[in-house]
């Protein structure tokens, strides 16, 4: 995750313009035609599917901070203009390529895509689609890929959280933060201390399963955690804020504690004081979920299928904070940038 975006630096046009509805005979898509400018809604001509590809009728699409950064030219991946943002979606299969064997027409699926999903149709490789069980809604399924894929790898694959351990989660009211709380509490039976920047967000985190909450805008996070966890500290910290919050989380760890870095929503990247790692035998590690798609697809795919399995079994409860129509895409971006969002923000294509 890159640095926090300051809305005071936005072009005024972002704050007042609606997406433009184009005319045509094909399907609608949100297009970034110029960096740092509002997206437009235009009619797009469909292209043929390749042998391994699947065309999906998109019902819901997740709105992620990475989409916003990409539309400003600030993301590590820089798709050529014009492009359609959107990395995760749910929908129904419309058409399959000649060599597709994993899904068939009519199947309900979730999928991941490299900036194609904010459209009424999306074409993606068959291996990046997973079928949705009958008892899971398309809306709940759309929440799973980025947030719960990340949460599952953070909690299990990286931190290896054990039942009864105490876990500190920062940025706990965001989509990924709530997913970490959900997985850690309801699947791994850990005790969660949720850290957020407001009392309202603290309340939401507790409602969603955290045992305790801390508003780190009102004082020392380390002192507050010490009162809740005791002098020994927490076993695991999962940080998405960076800067001073990361450092206080690190200092809140117990002997042989583990800290997992998921991002830098606060805009600052802290230097790790390695003496603390030595003195407490602490393990510090990072997690970039999307990278597993290219480096270790088996791990990536398992995180998706596991999220779906947990949802099917009723172990986890995906939380949607807001839903916008496709033509309100610029409002959805502002909602995220101005830190109004809690939980997953979705676009509805229906």
Swiss-Prot record:
For this UniProt entry, what's an example GO CC term? mitochondrion
Q: What class of enzyme is it?
A: oxidoreductase
Mention any Pfam family matching this sequence. ADH_zinc_N
One MF term in GO for this entry?
oxidoreductase activity
* UniProt keyword Acetylation present: yes
Residue list for modification N6-acetyllysine: 36, 302, 328
Sorted alphabetically, which InterPro entries does this protein's record hold?
ADH-like_C, ADH-like_N, GroES-like_sf, NAD(P)-bd_dom_sf, PKS_ER, Zn-ADH-like_protein
Q: Which residues carry this modification: N6-succinyllysine?
A: 201
Family membership noted in the UniProt record:
Belongs to the zinc-containing alcohol dehydrogenase family. Quinone oxidoreductase subfamily.
Q: What is this protein called?
A: Quinone oxidoreductase-like protein 2
